[in-house]
Amino acid sequence: MNIVVITGASSGMGREFAMQLDRGLHSVDEFWLIARRGSRLKEIASGMQHTVKILPLDLTNEADMTVLTESLEEEKPVVRMLINCAGYGMMGDFTAVPIKEQTGEVDLNCRALLEVTYGCLPYMRAKSRIIQLASSAAFLPQPGFSVYAATKSFVLSFSKALRAELKERQIYVTAVCPGPVKTEFFEVAEHYASTLAMKQYTMVEADRVVKDALRASSKNRPMSVCSLPIQAFWAMTRLLPQDPVICLVQKMREKGTEVIEEEKESE
């Protein structure tokens, strides 16, 4: 049995990957959709053409992670695609965001991604593909988004190294590095701080990011960087010294905070 495994499938990018692959991928027998919200997974599955295995799991919970590994061991499928989308971020100064929120980011964005990848690899064959959702935040340390950016740098670095390790097995790894995407992500991320206006102007739709990611994966590219502004940002981070750019980002944050405070005072 050939399957696609998608984490974070209940909303946002994970949901969009499931929808697009369901319409365009005919060489698999079943989709395994993983997320905490089982009811949302059922809604998504009801609109899909393929058979769907719903796994309402919290990947930060070791017992739930065991459910996934045991399901793989029991059914012994061929994992044709693994798409790791589960993750979240919290904006705000490091000391302003509760430490449990920030260790939770590391746990889900990094450890859970490692465990899912490790668990699926024994069931992958030549031409199988892995898509890891990183972020343009991986390109540069970001004041006010420090932990999230660090976790995505981890994902990008890990994906590049894993790609090299799996080359002889012909398992392809692509890291997806979008800028801001119009999803539920910012409903969580902005609990302690607001998005820079610049990020609001560079937001793109999830379907565009996913189309670009699937195209990059099918061509065995190491990265997918969607939209010209983010491609320009990526080039800038490769050409310019990091320290001045980081200082500029911090100054822009401080200016944005001043504007927000002035608006609040005028209300």
Regions found by a protein language model. Give the residues of each.
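SDR active-site lid
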Residues: 168-228
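Residue(s) in the substrate-gating loop at a strand-loop-helix junction
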Residues: 135
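Conserved glycine-rich cofactor-binding loop
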Residues: 10-11
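Conserved glycine-rich Rossmann-like NAD(P)H-binding loop of the short-chain dehydrogenase/reductase
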Residues: 26-43
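Active-site helix of classical SDR
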Residues: 117, 151
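Conserved NAD(P)H cofactor-binding loop of Rossmann-fold oxidoreductase domains
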Residues: 85-90
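Substrate-binding pocket helix/loop in short-chain dehydrogenase/reductase
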Residues: 93-94, 98-103
